[in-house]
């Protein structure tokens, strides 16, 4: 008999399983403006769902935007935005102006996309070369990526790099960590459930108690375990 499984509930798309976008303070991206402008960091805040702190920057033309705060950035710091900005920590530059070896973050692929690469806490990319109208950058994954020389990037390293090393210490901290993401936590094992909740549930002890292999054509409520497995268990030694 089919069961209403966790993945079936998630596939329905109820708010329980969706990312709570209504908690975000705004879109973290560069504004689509041209020219060279001077701005000021008016605040550094936390954006629910992000590990990296977010800087609120106000430009001289009145435009406000959110961007990843970089290491060493402080409130009331002056930054420069756009083509012709010097290579200084916190400035938003056209990546084509950056010499080889420059450390950048929040890098666009093309002008106007708002930033695509090296955006998470503690990450950065390195300018490694130029080829025609493209700039080659080395991503945190060590992959070399070609981006437009008109694309914008922030000089420096995204702040908050030690967040993954900070111990959670208690389950409540982990609860709030996942509460603002599109992830369900905790995940309960099927063998720990009641028989009405999962095909592996029930019994006086935690065991699948039946073959865990299941057909590729099984209905969704029964399609758990080793799906269309050619074999299970350890390989026999020669």
UniProtKB/Swiss-Prot annotation:
Pfam families assigned to the protein according to its UniProt record, in alphabetical order: Ribosomal_L2, Ribosomal_L2_C
Any one Gene Ontology cellular component term annotated for this protein: cytosolic large ribosomal subunit
Segments of skewed composition (Basic residues): 223-238
Highest taxon above the source species: Archaea
Annotated keywords: Ribonucleoprotein, Ribosomal protein, RNA-binding, rRNA-binding
Transmembrane domains' residue ranges: none
Region (Disordered): 200-238
Listed GO biological process terms: cytoplasmic translation
UniProt feature, compositional bias: Polar residues: 206-216
Molecular functions (GO terms): rRNA binding; structural constituent of ribosome
Function in brief: One of the primary rRNA binding proteins. Required for association of the 30S and 50S subunits to form the 70S ribosome, for tRNA binding and peptide bond formation. It has been suggested to have peptidyltransferase activity; this is somewhat controversial. Makes several contacts with the 16S rRNA in the 70S ribosome.
Protein family (similarity comment): Belongs to the universal ribosomal protein uL2 family.
NCBIfam families: PRK09612.1
Subunit comment: Part of the 50S ribosomal subunit. Forms a bridge to the 30S subunit in the 70S ribosome.
Name assigned to this protein: Large ribosomal subunit protein uL2
Species per Swiss-Prot/TrEMBL record: Saccharolobus islandicus (strain L.S.2.15 / Lassen #1) (Sulfolobus islandicus)
């Amino acid at each position: 008999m089919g069961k209403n499984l966790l993945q079936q509930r998630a596939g329905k798309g109820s708010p329980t399983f969706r990312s709570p976008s209504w908690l975000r303070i705004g879109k973290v991206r560069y504004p689509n403006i041209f020219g060279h402008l001077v701005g000021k960091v008016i605040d550094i805040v936390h954006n629910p769902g992000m590990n990296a702190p977010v800087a609120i920057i106000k430009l001289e033309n009145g435009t406000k935007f959110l961007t990843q705060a970089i290491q060493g950035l402080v409130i009331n710091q002056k930054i420069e935005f756009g083509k012709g900005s010097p290579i200084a920590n916190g400035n938003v530059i056209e990546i084509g102006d950056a010499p080889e070896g420059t450390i950048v973050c929040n890098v666009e692929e093309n002008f106007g996309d708002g930033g695509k690469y090296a955006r998470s806490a503690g990450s950065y990319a390195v300018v490694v070369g130029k080829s025609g109208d493209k700039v080659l950058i080395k991503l945190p994954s060590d992959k070399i990526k070609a981006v437009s020389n008109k694309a914008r990037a922030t000089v420096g390293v995204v702040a908050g790099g030690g967040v993954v090393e900070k111990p959670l210490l208690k389950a409540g901290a982990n609860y709030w960590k996942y509460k603002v993401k599109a992830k369900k936590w905790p995940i309960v094992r099927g063998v720990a459930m009641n028989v009405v909740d999962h095909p592996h549930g029930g019994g006086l002890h935690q065991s699948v108690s039946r073959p865990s292999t299941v057909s590729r054509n099984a209905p969704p409520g029964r399609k758990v375990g080793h799906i269309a497995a050619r074999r299970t268990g350890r390989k026999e030694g020669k």
